Structures are given as C-alpha cells and as structure tokens.
Amino acid sequence: MSRSIKKPPFCAPHVLRLVNKAIAQNKLNSIINIHSRSSVILNKFIGLTFGVYNGKTYVPVKVNDNMVGRKFGEFSPTRRYTGHVGDKKVSRK
C-alpha cells in the first residue's frame, strides 16, 4: 500500500537539519553522513552528496534530479553478492 496523498514525504528531521546547515555554510561539496535510509530524497537535496550508511561503511551518493522521490537506501546496497562458486568436481580423462 502506498503512502497517503494527504501526508508529506517522510524525511528525518536530523537529515533536514544537516542539509540546511550545509546550505547555510555553503558546504555543497562536502559529504553529509546519514544513517536514515528510509528518508525520501527531496528537491532541495539536488546537487548535494550524502554518505548513506549500509551497516559497515558510508556509501557516497550524489543526488541528481532523477533520484527525487526515492529513498536513500535504494542507492546503498547492504549485501554483497560474491557470485556462485565454481564446480568442484575433478575432471577425469
């Protein structure tokens, strides 16, 4: 079920506070580290770089206009695909 039209998009208050602080200090090229993967990317975030925490490290995410309306967690994978291991059968001649 999708979110109600009456409600605004969810964005954690501390993320908004960090963004407003970065814009006020004109630090648009610095990375803003956040843990809130469930926050929605808003229009005012375009051009900023966020470090989204994936449980181990901060993954840098540069926000562009195609990302607006999506969540930060979509751009920071938490699981690493190691691939399928090779066939361990010994070849016979």
From Swiss-Prot:
UniProt record, GO biological process: ribosomal small subunit assembly; translation
Question: Quick check: keyword Acetylation in the entry?
Answer: no
Query: Which PANTHER family would you find in this protein's record?
Result: RIBOSOMAL PROTEIN S19P FAMILY MEMBER, SMALL RIBOSOMAL SUBUNIT PROTEIN US19M
Naturally occurring in which organism (per UniProt): Ehrlichia chaffeensis (strain ATCC CRL-10679 / Arkansas)
Could you tell me the keywords of this UniProt record? Ribonucleoprotein, Ribosomal protein, RNA-binding, rRNA-binding
Give the transmembrane region(s): none
Annotated Gene Ontology cellular component terms = cytoplasm; small ribosomal subunit
Recorded name of the encoding gene: rpsS
- Write the lineage as a comma-separated list: Bacteria, Pseudomonadati, Pseudomonadota, Alphaproteobacteria, Rickettsiales
Report the sequence similarity comment from the record. Belongs to the universal ribosomal protein uS19 family.
The molecule here is called: Small ribosomal subunit protein uS19
Q: Sum up the protein's function in the record's words.
A: Protein S19 forms a complex with S13 that binds strongly to the 16S ribosomal RNA.
Origin: domain of life: Bacteria
The cross-references to InterPro entries, in alphabetical order and at most eight, read: Ribosomal_uS19, Ribosomal_uS19_bac-type, Ribosomal_uS19_CS, Ribosomal_uS19_SF
A Gene Ontology molecular-function term?
rRNA binding
